[in-house]
Regions:
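Compact beta-sheet-dominated domain cores in extracellular/mature segments
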Residues: 2-238
């Protein structure tokens, strides 16, 4: 299915008093909210406990703080707080790596950054056609916006988000030709982006975090248990 571009990306504003304003009311809100320079620190300083637990049920192995997870239900029962998750590894060795500490997650991602190789255009197209995660060694050549899609493989309705911007409540972002639907629990794939992107499974950038590193494709979020799960999103702009 060909995608329908309904993008109307805003620019980062000058509000620096907080990460972004909390959503009020139920009226549609098509404008993304600007992030403050300290947003990454502020948003993760005091994470709310998880409410109803929804299993990831990823099709790749799940690893928690470096240890394989055999029983995901038991893992959630033993943990009170949200997790920070990201794909690590290549090809058949890819895992969904979960961390209780966000700094540890970022360190693991950056270690993997140094192992990326330069791909030829032919290799890039072959890899993208396979719907597997691939990463480029020079993400600065990519678009600063991230585009998120209704379906896997960058198909279906699409909306794009510029750097240093976020949507704290995707249920208020209209979707579809008539704008009668919304983006909550809909996102199934992401485009390549120059910057890091985070998805959250609760409003106001709370809940579990799925971290999509800059320069990497995310053609099928369901592979990592994140298909139709995202409630809020951030393009970090760095």
């Amino acid at each position: 299915m060909a995608h329908r571009d309904i993008d109307d990306t805003g620019r980062a504003g000058e509000r620096t008093d907080r990460a972004a304003g909390r959503q009020q009311g139920t009226a549609p809100d098509e404008e993304p909210q600007p992030l403050s320079p300290t947003a990454a620190r502020d948003l993760f300083a005091d994470r709310a406990p998880l409410g109803l637990v929804r299993l990831f049920e990823a099709s790749v192995p799940l690893v928690l703080d470096g240890e394989p997870v055999e029983d995901e239900e038991r893992m959630h029962a033993d943990l009170a707080g949200p997790l920070h998750l990201t794909p690590l590894g290549r090809g058949d060795d890819t895992v969904l790596a979960a961390f209780t500490d966000r700094t540890a997650m970022l360190e693991a991602v950056r270690r993997e950054d140094t192992a990326y190789e330069e791909l030829s255009p032919e290799q890039v197209e072959q890899a993208r056609a396979s719907a597997k995660k691939i990463c480029v060694s020079n993400p600065t050549a990519l678009d600063a916006r991230v585009c998120f899609f209704e379906d896997a493989g960058e198909q279906g309705d699409v909306k794009c988000l510029g750097p240093e911007l976020g949507y704290p409540n995707l249920s208020r972002l209209p979707r579809g030709f008539l704008g009668t639907q919304n983006w909550n629990d809909v996102i199934s794939s992401l485009s390549w982006c120059r910057f890091d992107v985070s998805l959250f499974d609760a409003f106001d950038w709370q809940g579990n975090e799925f971290f999509a590193p800059k320069g990497c494709t995310t053609p099928d979020l369901s592979r990592f248990g994140w298909g139709d799960r995202t409630a809020s999103i951030v393009n970090w702009g760095s």
